[in-house]
From Swiss-Prot:
Record's protein name: Large ribosomal subunit protein uL11
Description of post-translational modifications: One or more lysine residues are methylated.
Assembly: Part of the ribosomal stalk of the 50S ribosomal subunit. Interacts with L10 and the large rRNA to form the base of the stalk. L10 forms an elongated spine to which L12 dimers bind in a sequential fashion forming a multimeric L10(L12)X complex.
Free-text function comment from the UniProt entry: Forms part of the ribosomal stalk which helps the ribosome interact with GTP-bound translation factors.
GO CC, alphabetical: cytosolic large ribosomal subunit
NCBIfam families attached to this UniProt entry: L11_bact (TIGR01632)
A Pfam family that the UniProt record links to this protein: Ribosomal_L11_N
Gene3D superfamilies: Ribosomal protein L11, C-terminal domain, Ribosomal protein L11/L12, N-terminal domain
PANTHER family reported in the protein's UniProt record: 60S RIBOSOMAL PROTEIN L12 (PTHR11661), LARGE RIBOSOMAL SUBUNIT PROTEIN UL11M (PTHR11661:SF1)
The keyword Manganese belongs to this UniProt entry's keyword annotation: no
Keyword Ribosomal protein attached: yes
């Protein structure tokens, strides 16, 4: 018989450096999960992507065990890296803070395809382009 799911928790954590302090501790502690066990497993799984923000979907079962799935980094994080900027614009329609090429947009879309609902690469590119525009990043 399958285990009974008691909770699903979504967290965005820096790859390879999760620790029991907030947000991990409070989010998992209230469900009785062994926090250090999660941190060690997450860090081992994401060590090669160190420094990137990685979303994790944690499924917690009635016996206090857990499983987790890591997703691809958010499009905004990938765009900030590609444009080599610190953060997006506070006024995206007035102030442009960086530039990315169409090739970079396509590369990000290929990486994000597994987590997106887009039917093809062209639709994924349009989605990523929209994210870039809303961050004040110009597409050249």
């Amino acid at each position: 018989m399958a285990k009974k799911i008691t909770a699903k928790v979504k967290l965005q954590l820096p790859a390879g450096s999760a620790n029991p302090s907030p947000p991990v501790g409070p989010a998992l502690g209230q469900h009785g999960v062994n926090i250090m066990e999660f941190c060690k497993a997450f860090n081992a799984k994401t060590m090669e992507q160190k420094g990137t923000i990685i979303p994790a979907l944690i499924t917690i079962y009635a016996d206090r065990s857990f499983t987790f799935i890591t997703k691809t980094p958010p499009a905004s994080v990938l765009l900030v890296k590609a444009a080599k900027i610190d953060k997006g614009s506070g006024e995206p329609n007035k102030n442009k803070v960086g530039k990315v090429t169409a090739a970079q947009i396509e590369e990000i879309a290929k990486l994000k395809m597994v987590d997106m609902t887009a039917k093809d690469l062209e639709a994924a590119c349009r989605t990523i382009s929209g994210t870039a525009r809303s961050m004040g990043i110009e597409i050249v």
